[in-house]
Amino acid sequence: MITLGIETSCDETAIALYDSKNGLIGEAVFSQIELHRDYGGVIPELASRDHCQKITHIFKEALGDINPNSIDQIAYTAGPGLLGALLIGENFAHGLALALSKPLVPVNHLEGHLIAPFLSGDKLDFPFLTLLVSGGHSLIIDVKDLNDYEILGQSRD
């Protein structure tokens, strides 16, 4: 199964294709660090506009020679994140899913970080405790199993 993943929660436009048999088969990332550097932090409106300008190019770059019809599902970051930035990724995902007649999978940004180690093929034994630090969100999580976890504490950034 090939999943196209779209990430636009903050200041990076990223698209990847993951094949459940072969692993990562395509990816492209555009960072907005230079755009926001002079402001000392991410400006949400600038981030949204830049996602809008870059997302089609990033999609084509990630796709490479892969036929879009071979994509089985489209996942996108549904939150948390900057609202405008999230909407760019979500709308792109919806348009692509409609054009290709593929199902959509909304993904919680933080849950994506939580399960990312499983994609590398590493074996993790349940249960485990993890510290998840991502931008303005930090969590301590008791992971009992896939889709079975409890947030023990979190920051108030």
Residues of each region from the PLM?
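Short acidic/glycine-rich loops and adjacent helix/strand connectors
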Residues: 1-157
